[in-house]
Amino acid sequence: MGSRALLLLKVALPLKHQIKCLNYTKITPASELLTKRRFSIKATNGSSLQPPDVSRLAETARISLNQNEVEEFAPKIRQVIDWFGQLQAVDLNSVEPAIRADSEGENLRDDVPETFSEREAIIAAVPSYEKPYVKVPKVLNKE
C-alpha cells in the first residue's frame, strides 16, 4: 500500500497567461494507477471579473485605509481577481467529478477482525458501559 502526492512546480509566467485546458493521462507502473496532468498555456487579456473598488472593499471589511494604501493595494487586488479569472477559464469537461479529493483509488487497510486480550481493562477504562455496548457522547447534532 502506498501513498499519493501531487508535486506542483511553479513556473514564472506573465499575469496575462492562463491555463487553457487540463487533460489527464493515465500511467500504470507496477499495478499502481498514477495521474499525470498536462496543460497548455494561452495568452489572454486578463480576467472577465471586475476588480472591486478598494475604498468600498476596505469599508465593507471595516478597516481604514488612507489614499496611499488604497493606491498600493489596488494593483494587488486586481492581480488576485485575475488569478480567479484564470481559474474560471480552466476546462473541466474532461475531469470526472469526485465526492472527495481522495476518492480515487483504495487507501484503506484490510478489514481484519481482532480479539482484544485485555477486554476487562478496556471496559474499566470507558466512562459508561451497558453490556454489551459502550456508551459515548452524542457526536451528531440531531435533535
UniProtKB/Swiss-Prot annotation:
Record EC number: 6.3.5.-
Presence of keyword Cell inner membrane: no
Entry keyword annotation includes ATP-binding: yes
Keywords: ATP-binding, Chloroplast, Ligase, Mitochondrion, Nucleotide-binding, Plastid, Protein biosynthesis
Protein location: Mitochondrion; Plastid, Chloroplast
Top-level taxon in the UniProt lineage: Eukaryota
Catalysed reactions, as listed in the record: L-glutamyl-tRNA(Gln) + L-glutamine + ATP + H2O = L-glutaminyl-tRNA(Gln) + L-glutamate + ADP + phosphate + H(+)
Main location (coarse class): mitochondrion
EC class (word): ligase
Record-level GO BP terms: glutaminyl-tRNAGln biosynthesis via transamidation; mitochondrial translation; regulation of translational fidelity
GO molecular-function terms, A-Z: ATP binding; glutaminyl-tRNA synthase (glutamine-hydrolyzing) activity
GO cellular component, one term: glutamyl-tRNA(Gln) amidotransferase complex
PANTHER family associated with the record: GLUTAMYL-TRNA(GLN) AMIDOTRANSFERASE SUBUNIT C, MITOCHONDRIAL
Family matches, as HAMAP family: GatC (MF_00122)
Family: Belongs to the GatC family.
Other remarks in the entry: This protein may be expected to contain an N-terminal transit peptide but none has been predicted.
Function: Allows the formation of correctly charged Gln-tRNA(Gln) through the transamidation of misacylated Glu-tRNA(Gln) in chloroplasts and mitochondria. The reaction takes place in the presence of glutamine and ATP through an activated gamma-phospho-Glu-tRNA(Gln).
Quaternary context: Subunit of the heterotrimeric GatCAB amidotransferase (AdT) complex, composed of A, B and C subunits.
The protein, known as: Glutamyl-tRNA(Gln) amidotransferase subunit C, chloroplastic/mitochondrial
